[in-house]
Amino acid sequence: MKIWTSEHVFDHPWETVTTAAMQKYPNPMNPSVVGVDVLDRHIDASGKLHSHRLLSTEWGLPSIVKSIIGAARTKTYVQEHSVVDPVAKTMELKSTNISFTNMVSVDERLIYKPHPQDSEKTVLTQEAIITVKGVSLGSYLEGLMASTISSNANKGREAMEWVIHKLNAEIEELTASARGSIRTPMAAAAFVEK
């Protein structure tokens, strides 16, 4: 078993970061995620948003893994459960693979919280527990997978920034459009009065 952990601070408020987290896929930084399906989404009695999603991924595999499972590329599935608490301002996301569970399990947990000293920033804490089963090189493969998870976490943070930029651009466009539609009737009224 290998445990990987990381912490990152986003220079954006919690509301922005959690909105981006829910819209993270697809993105150009991680093209291996080829599909996201929402299986269930509801708000509980306390106002928390619960989501259960299925992520479809397609990976190119290292040569040692290819020889073990006999494939060069493989489609895998990950189930993801998230809970967003708008009152406590926390988002917890747990994911686990549901493909190849007889060979490997990857359990990941992400927590988004406002930065304790700066409400305009958000702290992301990540943890992944990797277990390779029934292979003599299990420890080596777990280390290799931890390295891949670390690289993908960096890509994930880049993707979050990309989504946030995209969301901000959409907001600016809507704001400009709304201002234009407000000015048009006002300009017409001013023209009629002359």
Swiss-Prot record:
GO BP terms: phospholipid transport
Keyword Phosphoprotein (UniProt): yes
UniProt keyword terms in alphabetical order: Phosphoprotein
Name of the molecule in the record: PRELI domain containing protein 3B
UniProt similarity note: Belongs to the slowmo family.
Tagged with keyword Oxidoreductase: no
A GO MF label: phosphatidic acid transfer activity
Any one of the GO CC terms: mitochondrial intermembrane space
Domain PRELI/MSF1 intervals: 1-172
Phosphoserine, modified sites: S46, S51
Superkingdom of origin: Eukaryota
The organism of origin for this protein: Sus scrofa
